[in-house]
A protein has these predicted regions:
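N-terminal targeting signals for export/organelle localization
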Residues: 2-50, 224-243
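A short beta-strand-turn-helix
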Residues: 46-68
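The N-terminal extracellular segments of secreted preproproteins, especially immediately downstream
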Residues: 4, 54, 75-78, 94, ...
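A generic local structural motif
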Residues: 53-57, 84, 177-179
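C-terminal cap of thioredoxin/glutaredoxin-like
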Residues: 25, 71, 150-243
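General secretory precursor processing signal
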Residues: 58, 79-82, 204
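Extracellular/mature segments of secreted proteins
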Residues: 46, 62-65, 85-87, 209-211
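Structural alpha/beta surface segment adjacent to cysteine/selenocysteine redox centers
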Residues: 66-153, 226, 231-234
């Protein structure tokens, strides 16, 4: 009898956990669908709101560039920059625009520093990002101050030059992003592809290609692509393999 009771209790725990997981997935799917329909109801206008912003490699976007927004916090361990740099290098017709949604004072400080460094050296700024972002396989990113000192050397600038940029263009960019993302970006990283928000999606360069293709097809009214977009975002939100 005791053995049967333990088996029943074990079954009950498993069933409860399974039901809870199904309930969570249903709630996520419902939210993803509502967000997708809202995004699709808005006419996609590439580049609107991104005037004057530079691509990840430092270029200004061409007239027909494929605009990709990457919303991130530099306190987010899933907001690494390496795969995104690879994607930008492999697709010169794309323009990947970093947008900031800092979740803490430390994240704000890092975002401002990144944008200030970009004014002098794209390479130094990207190296700084990679150094200070928390790594999924390591709980200890490089100390902010040490990474910044190295960035001064990489960009061949003085602390005074950096400080001037910090309170000028960098502050304007980060403030504008924070305001634009309020109430729209709820998780990081979030990609915006053809005006569709892919929240909590940590894409590799190859996965980003596939996600962009799905977004393009969804915008043409392809129902299979629209369904798959929803599935990809749901899996991202649930911490599952996306593509």
């Amino acid at each position: 009898m005791k053995t049967l009771s333990l088996i029943f209790l074990f079954w009950l725990v498993i069933t409860t956990d399974s039901s809870a997981a199904e309930t969570d997935r249903f709630a996520v799917e419902k939210d993803v669908t509502a967000t997708f329909l809202k995004d699709m109801s808005v006419t996609y206008r590439p580049g609107v709101g991104l005037e004057g912003r530079r691509c990840l490699d430092g270029r200004l976007p061409g007239k027909d560039a494929e605009m990709i927004e990457f919303w991130a916090s530099l306190e987010c361990s899933y907001c690494g920059i390496r795969e995104l740099v690879k994607a930008q290098q492999e697709h010169p017709d794309w323009c990947v625009v970093v947008r900031h949604i800092p979740a803490s004072p430390e994240g704000l400080r890092k975002a401002l520093s990144f944008e200030a460094l970009r004014k002098f050296s794209t390479s130094a700024a990207l190296t700084f990002w990679d150094a200070v972002i928390p790594k999924k396989d390591s709980p200890m990113p490089r100390p902010y101050e040490g990474a910044l000192i190295q960035a001064y050397a990489d960009a061949a600038i003085s602390e005074a030059d950096f400080s001037a940029a910090l309170t000028g263009d960098a502050a304007d960019i980060v403030d504008a992003d924070t305001e634009a993302g309020r109430g729209i970006i709820s998780s990081t990283p979030t990609y915006v592809l053809r005006g569709i928000r892919f929240g909590s999606c940590d894409f590799t360069a190859k996965q980003l290609e596939r996600a962009l293709d799905l977004a393009r097809r969804a915008r043409t009214g392809d129902p299979d692509a629209a369904r798959e977009v929803g599935e990809v975002i749901t899996r991202g939100r649930m911490g599952e393999k996306m593509l």
